[in-house]
Amino acid sequence: MTTESKTKTVTHILGYPRVGAQRELKFAQEKYWRGEIEQKELLAVGSELRQRHWKDQSASGLDFVTAGDFAWYDHVLTTSLLLGHVPARHNNGFPDLDTLFKVGRGQSQNSCGCGEAASDMTKWFNTNYHYIVPEFSKNDKFNVSWSQLFDEIAEAQKQGHNVKPVLLGPLSYLWLGKEVNDEEVEQGFDRLSLLPRLLTAYQAIFSKLSALGVEWVQIDEPILALELPKAWADSFKLAYQVIQSDVKLLLTTYFDGVEHHLDKITKLAVNGLHIDVSAAPDQLDAIVSALPKEWVLSVGAVNGRNVWRADLERLHERLQPVKEALGDKLWIASSCSLLHSPVDLEQETELSKETLQWFAFAKQKLREVTLLADALDGNQNAILACHQYSQPLRERESAEHINKPAVQQRLAAITPALAERAEAYSVRAQHQAEKLGLPLLPTTTIGSFPQTSDIRQQRSAYRTGKLNEQDYVTAMKGHIADAVERQERLDLDVLVHGEAERNDMVEYFAENLNGFQATRFGWVQSYGSRCVKPAIVVADIEREAPITVSWTQYAQSLTTKQMKGMLTGPVTILGWTFPREDITRKEIAQQLALVLRDEVSDLQQAGINIIQIDEPAIREGLPIKKSDQKAYLDWAVEAFKISAASAKSETQIHTHMCYSEFNEIIESVAALDADVITIETSRSNMELLKAFEDFNYPNEIGPGVYDIHSPNIPSQEWIVDLIETAAARVPVERLWVNPDCGLKTRNWKETEAALENMVKAAKALRKKWQSNAA
């Protein structure tokens, strides 16, 4: 029997969702960007959300509330402004909130649409969250210029909270950025050389934190979970010697284990270490054994990246020996920031009682942390509560409707041949050229068109029963017809139906497949004001009937041009949903691949000659340790190929990827064997094409020629320059012209203006190059 401990287990979280339970921040941001509210109104929304979230943390019994996790766009961009590190094109003196939005979006409030280019955006490790990439040059200086962190600490202290600020560490900040001057790089510049200057700014930050009476700072160094180059790993010791102060540092890691750097970590001038035992449970024992006696160990036991209820009973059993070994040096926390979780499960009033008992959102995870800590402290009521809390998970393990025999039989029948097209690309390309009759530099879009308020209202009315199915179908067909008419007027070569019926490229499929659970308010931030609502994989996945065929077939009936069928690929559906935790990700991907394979067959049979299987998330699913990546890529590629391999040779399979760095996965991208790949490249000025050029990528490619994430409208000349840059790296006969990504978040006015310039640019170069060839 566990006796009550005399040492209290300290509790905290690494961060909290900032968007609000009703996406209040998103709507306020967008109103501000449209010029509908003043900045003071936006600031008031942020303050109200922070105070609510701190109150939730305090009410749950956490020993610290976390400050500094709030961001107006993303926390890396916030760090850039804190450090006074703003690209020169956006730097008009002292940085302010409009500066931040200009770096992230290219402009702040509505303007002429001719702002400076936004900074690059990429995925945050292997999550679906994004950050704005810091830009580094050899003469960069850093100085504390942006008071948000200090203001928010004071704000929380004023509310009476015990505050633990969070700050992105100096090595991770440098690692997450990029050198932007090719000439400097050629001369030997490496952003790591900026570390001494950067550390001076961090010293100033800690001086200010000390003056605010801060005892502990959570300093995030997630790159310690990576297999770092020696120069980077060796830099930690000096960096933390330089920035040590009278403020205690909790060195914070997440998303994977750090035992491979343990010998270096234990020599750092810090006061504690946070590890993610949800992502990497096997590291725990080695770290407990090696932990310096004076350090605290914060164990990230409650998964911040998924929605499943924590198995508190098993966690208590696993961590009890750790508590006995460490006593009051043990802290309990979320594995990572809870910004990757939806806000509050209590809003999900439409879920069944059984289903509700499987899940915990961010607000519920606060109580999981404190309940587990109480149990570890020997509180008998808490120990009993942990047992009872885990019971629904035990009952689910044996539920017959979770593991389905028919699905298991199809999985067992998978062979290597199931993943192969009938003929090689070189042969397929000839069949497709004859069948499709497309011009040089064919123009197309990535799939979605603007989701107008009418579309959203009609979908909502249908979902709530206010609009019957017949009227809903009529309304959606009207939007499809409008999209087709606009594309024909623009003279695009390959059309799409616009996806008016789809709320989200993943959620739509999840709602039409068995084995998923959708939510009403399960929103999580993706970037800036963009939020996504991932479905939850709860059981084996099956398709009862075709999902996309009727809409695509209707769109094709309206035009003599080729209409693309639009599917979301198995790896992306997996990556952008909350997966089951009782089977492997590979098995979920295979289940998805089989149902998408059936959809490809049905589209083909319905007369659709081009089918796009989007895989924008294939790179973000990579394990963050390189040594683990091959196994993932093997099954990810296999899943895509199973999806596509039912296509005949004359059926052209497209795929789309965005925000990806292709160098390290180019072999796997080629192994997908898609006939055409479209990629996001405009922000990076076609830099990403170098990987395809160096690899001699054999199939067709459509590098994005304008950035759909920015409201700026690209000129025809700008697009011509990008196409010419692309043509220097990809044979023009294999080149497509398209935007970077889908257009659902844009409005029709800017969409048509941009596409008009894109088509004109393609036609001008088509005429020029065909004349030269003649």
From Swiss-Prot:
Annotated binding of 5-methyltetrahydropteroyltri-L-glutamate, by residue: 23-26, 123, 530-531, 576, 620
Active site feature: 709 (proton donor)
Functional description taken from the UniProt entry: Catalyzes the transfer of a methyl group from 5-methyltetrahydrofolate to homocysteine resulting in methionine formation.
Lineage, opening ranks: Bacteria, Pseudomonadati, Pseudomonadota, Gammaproteobacteria, Vibrionales
Pathway: Amino-acid biosynthesis; L-methionine biosynthesis via de novo pathway; L-methionine from L-homocysteine (MetE route): step 1/1
MF terms in GO: 5-methyltetrahydropteroyltriglutamate-homocysteine S-methyltransferase activity; zinc ion binding
One GO BP annotation of this record: methionine biosynthetic process
Cofactors: Zn(2+)
Catalyzed reaction equations: 5-methyltetrahydropteroyltri-L-glutamate + L-homocysteine = tetrahydropteroyltri-L-glutamate + L-methionine
Protein name: 5-methyltetrahydropteroyltriglutamate--homocysteine methyltransferase
Tree of life domain: Bacteria
Residues the record lists as binding L-homocysteine: 446-448, 499, 614
Similarity section: Belongs to the vitamin-B12 independent methionine synthase family.
Residues at which L-methionine binds: 446-448, 499, 614
Keyword hit for Methyltransferase: yes
Amino-acid positions noted as binding Zn(2+) in the UniProt annotation, renumbered to this chain: 656, 658, 680, 741
UniProt KW keywords: Amino-acid biosynthesis, Metal-binding, Methionine biosynthesis, Methyltransferase, Repeat, Transferase, Zinc
Cystine connections: none
Cofactor binding description: Binds 1 zinc ion per subunit.
